Design a protein with these regions (language model features):
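Peripheral, non-AAA+ core regions of ATP-driven protein-machinery
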Residues: 1-12, 17-25, 30-37, 46-49, ...
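Conserved RecA-like ASCE P-loop NTPase motor core of nucleic-acid helicases/translocases
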Residues: 50-54
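Conserved Walker A/P-loop ATP-binding site and its immediately adjacent core
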Residues: 55-62
């Protein structure tokens, strides 16, 4: 059944599966409760009764938050309770189609002596809620706390038990949020959902590429656009590099949003194959907007951005760069080229530098695609 939140449905694999147990984690204040409250109201209007159980707020507080978000649904039932036996009794009495428990760390079983949030309580409560979902055929959503390292708090057995594990990510001081699946028995784990946090709650972002590029500087050295592929969704991202002389012995390598080891490998290839001396340079690489991009198709963009920053030579503003780079400096083929180029063309880009081996003879692409075989060739073409 559809949740009424298209971005959530995309990540879940097309919609909410009756009888499924979904765990959603994220940093405090990131918007987990807001997302599930909005989804609960939409589900209540579309599919029938939803029981929203809050162990962290009173029913009056949840009601106030729902009113502030402009949510109205007569079938949305709010319960402030932490004892699981009482929650089960309310489920039996109200017979909801969907149950939301916010959060699993606040719920406890009365016949266990340990405190709520302990390993035994989380494990046993998770097992009971799984049984409730399967026997009654209701979809159950659990909110989970995370540790300082960003992993879900509690026993790992909980993640093995549930059908789907979602992470809600983003910078607390930024406006956008990304919902990712790291486990999904009913769909792909490659899809993402993008939201924007506003005064009226979370707003879906159907075109995240435009949002990520909204503040892109034009004519700046070290800035390169690439088209990432998250599942079936293409995303245009700005990869930035800053190369400066090192003043303290060992040069620094700082990476945000990309894979650190891969960036170090690309810098070594730049020095060996393209003759750019980086051993005395600090290099900082960032995926703008706090996004993440760890696929090999970003290799060429990272390398070109570093070369651009080193030489203080900006790229043309209407070009996107795609390709995997091998240790010998060759540019390797990537998948989903046409999908990526179509997204770039839709946002006004007219040129693309891509692996020559990815181009199909006679194919008609939505923009001018130039093939390259080596990193040195790409750098010569783009930054001279």
């Amino acid at each position: 059944m559809h949740s009424g939140v298209a971005e959530l449905d995309r990540v879940l694999g097309g919609g909410v599966v009756p009888g499924s147990l979904v765990l959603i984690g994220g940093d405090p204040g990131i918007g987990k409760s807001t997302l599930l409250l909005q989804a609960s109201a939409a589900l209540a209007r579309a599919a029938g009764p939803v029981l929203y159980v809050s162990g962290e707020e009173s029913a009056a507080q949840v009601k106030l938050r729902a009113e502030r978000l402009g949510l109205a649904a007569s079938e949305l039932l709010i319960l402030a309770e932490t004892q699981l036996e009482t929650i089960e009794a309310h489920v039996g009495a109200s017979e909801p189609r969907t149950l939301v428990v916010d959060s699993i760390q606040t719920v406890y079983l009365g016949d266990l002596e340990s405190a709520p949030g302990s390993v035994s309580q989380v494990r046993e409560c998770g097992g009971r809620l799984m049984g409730l979902a399967k026997t009654r055929g209701i979809a159950v959503f659990l909110v989970g706390h995370v540790t300082k390292e960003g992993a879900l708090a509690g026993p790992r057995v909980l993640e093995h038990l549930v059908d789907t594990v979602l992470y809600f990510e983003g910078e607390r001081h930024a406006t956008y949020r990304v919902l990712r699946a790291v486990k999904n028995r009913f769909g792909s784990t490659n899809e993402i959902g993008v939201f924007e946090m506003t005064d009226g709650g979370l707003r879906e972002v159907p075109n995240p590429s435009a949002m990520f590029l909204a503040e892109r500087p034009h004519g700046a050295a070290g800035s390169v656009i690439m088209a990432a592929l998250e599942g079936t969704r293409p995303l245009l991202l700005e990869l930035q590099a800053l190369v400066t002389p090192a003043h303290f012995g060992t040069p620094r390598r700082t990476v945000l949003g990309a894979e650190y080891n891969r960036v170090c490998l690309l810098l070594a290839i730049l020095e060996k194959r393209a003759g750019i001396p980086l051993q005395s340079q600090d290099v900082f690489v960032n995926v703008a907007g706090g996004a993440r991009c760890q696929e090999p198709a970003a290799d060429l963009a990272i390398a070109v951005a570093s070369a651009s920053s080193y030489g203080e030579r900006p790229l043309a503003p209407d070009v996107v760069v795609l390709g995997e780079v091998g240790l010998t400096g060759e540019v390797r083929a990537i998948g989903g080229l046409e999908t990526r180029l179509r997204e770039a063309a839709a946002l006004g880009f007219t040129q693309a530098v891509v692996p020559r081996s990815s181009l199909v003879a006679g194919a008609r692409y939505p923009l001018t695609a130039t093939g390259v075989s080596t990193l040195e060739e790409a750098i010569g073409l783009l930054v001279g």
